């Protein structure tokens, strides 16, 4: 058994139903919330209210209605824990097609590989190779409701096969289904004193669906999927035909119960908190008011992302962003930088880089992310 197994066990520990004193909210398939494209990554891991791009399927499919192109495809690759291993990664492929000026459809496949694990129970045995992985397949339909506003609905299938069968015969692959509801507003070009501008806003309630069960044991624990609410807005300053600067802000909240049930030791002392075992719909509504410390802790469950994107001639881009999460809820804090290029043939290439500013090490720290897109006119 090699050292990679220890890394995999560390990653899979996120499925543990118990949370320690920080009361971090845990879910199954957390990779669903990881930014898979370099543009959004360069803007502080956000995209619900940015301008439309080929990866809008993940952030807000309603944006496709405002695309100037008829269809497009995109690919991305993100190494994970690249400082420790070289075969854990997140990959994504997305496609969209505008049926008309009022409607569009889109789809994507996201695949998260935890790499190959060689397991030896006896040094003389032939290694048994395990390949835990997770993937999702989704499709969306978007409809323009007015000149400036569109909404979309998405359906998603989730599969999580993270069992190590040779070590644990009581676990199995888990699956679920989910839906998303999103909306996007983009104003007309408005003239101001010395510049033009476009106002944008968006929301996305994603991964609304049943919990996942990994245990074969009857009555075994089920894990919530990461139902999530994104709210964002932004403004693009257009200084002339070649130069523009877009500012965007996004707020996120997980719509799953907080760890609020006390776990006691033999002396009756509180040693941890765990999530209540309730239905996923009840959990969504309960998530707005179940934190043990009341409204103050509910506010701490919000994450914030701020991004800047400078565009020259709509062909060269420089990006920067900041992401912040409260220490009690995970303490993810990082700065992101990125760049992008777009050719006359609508080929786009984007790169981003993450720099952690927290004591908590990010698995994506010092990782270069790459994404490619191509539009068809």
Residue locations for each model-derived region?
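Subset of outer-membrane beta-barrel
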Residues: 20-377
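Bacterial Sec-dependent N-terminal signal peptides
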Residues: 1-22, 308
């Amino acid at each position: 058994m090699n050292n990679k197994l220890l890394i995999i066990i560390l990653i899979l520990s996120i499925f543990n139903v118990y949370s320690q004193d920080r009361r971090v909210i845990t879910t199954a398939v957390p990779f669903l919330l990881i930014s898979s494209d370099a543009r959004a990554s360069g803007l502080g891991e956000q995209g619900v209210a940015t301008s439309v791009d080929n990866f809008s399927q993940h952030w807000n499919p309603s944006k496709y209605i405002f695309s100037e192109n008829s269809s497009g495809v995109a690919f991305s690759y993100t190494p994970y824990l690249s400082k420790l291993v070289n075969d854990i990664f997140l990959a994504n492929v997305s496609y969209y097609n505008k049926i008309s000026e009022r409607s569009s459809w889109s789809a994507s496949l996201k695949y998260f590989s935890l790499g190959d694990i060689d397991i030896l129970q006896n040094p003389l045995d032939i290694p048994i190779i395990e390949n835990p992985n997770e993937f999702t397949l989704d499709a969306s339909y978007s409809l323009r409701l007015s000149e400036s506003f569109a909404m979309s609905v998405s359906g998603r299938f989730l599969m999580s096969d993270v069992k190590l069968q040779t070590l644990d015969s009581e676990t199995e692959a888990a699956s679920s289904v989910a839906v998303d509801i999103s909306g996007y507003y983009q104003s007309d070009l408005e003239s101001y004193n010395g510049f033009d501008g476009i106002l944008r806003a968006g929301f996305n309630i994603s991964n609304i669906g049943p919990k996942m069960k990994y245990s074969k044991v009857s009555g075994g624990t089920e894990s919530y999927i990461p139902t999530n609410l994104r709210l964002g807005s932004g403004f693009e300053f257009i200084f002339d035909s070649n130069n523009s600067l877009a500012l965007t802000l996004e707020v996120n909240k997980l719509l799953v119960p907080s760890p609020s049930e006390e776990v006691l030791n033999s002396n009756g002392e509180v040693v941890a908190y765990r999530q209540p075992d309730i239905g996923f719909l009840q959990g969504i509504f309960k998530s707005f008011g179940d934190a043990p410390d009341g409204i103050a802790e509910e506010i701490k469950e919000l994450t914030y992302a701020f991004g800047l994107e400078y565009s020259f001639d709509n062909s060269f881009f420089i990006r920067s962003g900041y992401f912040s999460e409260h220490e009690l809820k995970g303490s993810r804090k990082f700065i992101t930088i990125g760049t992008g290029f777009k050719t006359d043939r609508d080929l786009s290439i984007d790169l981003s880089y993450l720099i952690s500013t927290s004591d908590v090490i990010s698995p994506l720290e010092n990782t270069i992310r790459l994404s490619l897109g191509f539009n068809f006119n």
